[in-house]
């Protein structure tokens, strides 16, 4: 299960799960700035890392993104952990693309 980095109030009426792009982690300058700005509006922002980025953090070695299947499974794990009732998902670049793909899959599943 991914580790979360959370900005904004736990009691917020809406939570945004925000995924990083292919080349930078969840705590990059861009992600910090965007998450902080969104949290200032009263939205809870929850960031996480895909497995390859977590491994990069632990080993210091760059590696390519995981296969699409793993990225989508990670998104499903995040959604299950956070609950979907008041959850919006998105991300930067690759993270946003995976968010839109998993959203389409979940919608088709009902």
Residue positions per predicted region:
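A conserved short beta-strand
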Residues: 108-110
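Gly/Ala-rich beta-loop-alpha elbow adjacent to hydrolase catalytic centers
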Residues: 91-95, 99
């Amino acid at each position: 299960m991914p580790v979360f980095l959370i900005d904004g109030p736990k009691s917020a009426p809406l939570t945004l799960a925000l995924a990083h792009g292919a080349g930078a982690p969840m705590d990059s300058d861009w992600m910090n700035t965007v998450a902080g700005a969104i949290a200032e509006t009263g939205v809870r922002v929850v960031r996480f890392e895909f497995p390859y980025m977590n491994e990069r953090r632990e080993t210091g070695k760059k590696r390519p993104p995981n296969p699409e299947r793993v990225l989508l499974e990670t998104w499903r794990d995040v959604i299950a952990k956070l609950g979907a009732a008041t959850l919006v998902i998105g991300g930067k670049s690759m993270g946003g693309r995976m968010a839109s793909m998993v959203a389409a899959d979940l919608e088709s599943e009902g």
